[in-house]
């Protein structure tokens, strides 16, 4: 078998393989002999069919099978011997086969790029320094009360955190526009659901009033025909409601799993949950900066096949979130996911190189700690730990997460790390905004 490897373009490779005619004939003869022992042809006993007849009837089928098998096996041997690492499915390109002659075919594919990490010491990371304070716990308790609040009719003016029911009709230069009209629209104020100026225009008015609000659509508004346009909304304010917050009674507190129903017990549980969230948020913030710096410091040739594969993963994930199936997933526009897929491939390649070059292995203690941390958020942590330990796929996911953490720590060891004091709310907002 003769093998040649050449670069087509960038990460593209072409392997050309020549299979000697003798090897093909030997394999064909062997398969025909096997077939002769089992084929049934009228007029002949099983295993006594003449070879010439077996060859006449099954020769072409056997030849095709042999060529397909030889192409695959020889290609695998060739890439192992030449230490080539393909990405994605290879594209086989056979030449015309002529009986008695050597068979030539080529295989085209992409390879993973060779990566030499550089400038890791130039990566800058700001590590948040945060503690959960009493006032943070107070704010979280207030949030819990708001989530459990009841809405009561209000006779006074609309305030920033009220809820209103309105009819509205929008127009631009006197002309109505699509999506600008609604009746009995319920709006909880202060959540940023409407365009700038809409909620502000409601504040100070009372139920039963009719008035007009002037607004300007943002330049980055999703509807092209409305970007930057000035509009007027005719408002009929039908109802104003305000929250009636529940008191921190024993009954209320027990809803959150606090057996003794005490305020101290609730505060302790809330603080514990906030500290767990804080730990994850700090880890996420630091990791995000490390990865951003890693990508910025290292240019990587990206295999198109790897990006294509990642796009399909993202398509399926998006479809699953909205209850779609496999067919619907692949109909989603690929360009929606291309940039995200490309970045994920780049990050995977770079972190993979950090792991390989430092010969990192997932540490058992870290894997256990990650599982324990996830389990601590559930009512019965031991049950969750057991579930993870019995599921090999979940365990592999945790091991990969542990390896990523170890890789990030390896980069941090040489990065420029500074500390910055901040507060719980600011950090959580930063993490949520990405």
Curated annotation (Swiss-Prot):
UniProt GO MF annotations: peptidyl-prolyl cis-trans isomerase activity; protein folding chaperone; ribosome binding
Entry's localization field: Cytoplasm
The PPIase FKBP-type domain, residue ranges: 161-246
Documented EC number(s): 5.2.1.8
UniProtKB keywords: Cell cycle, Cell division, Chaperone, Cytoplasm, Isomerase, Rotamase
Catalytic reaction list: [protein]-peptidylproline (omega=180) = [protein]-peptidylproline (omega=0)
Predominant cellular place of this UniProt entry's protein: cytoplasm
GO cellular component, one term: cytoplasm
GO terms, biological process: 'de novo' cotranslational protein folding; cell division; chaperone-mediated protein folding; protein transport; protein unfolding
Function recorded in the entry: Involved in protein export. Acts as a chaperone by maintaining the newly synthesized protein in an open conformation. Functions as a peptidyl-prolyl cis-trans isomerase.
Family per similarity comment: Belongs to the FKBP-type PPIase family. Tig subfamily.
HAMAP family xref list: Trigger_factor_Tig
Comment text on domains: Consists of 3 domains; the N-terminus binds the ribosome, the middle domain has PPIase activity, while the C-terminus has intrinsic chaperone activity on its own.
Protein name in the entry: Trigger factor
Organism: Proteus mirabilis (strain HI4320)
Organism classification: Bacteria, Pseudomonadati, Pseudomonadota, Gammaproteobacteria, Enterobacterales
Gene that encodes the chain: tig
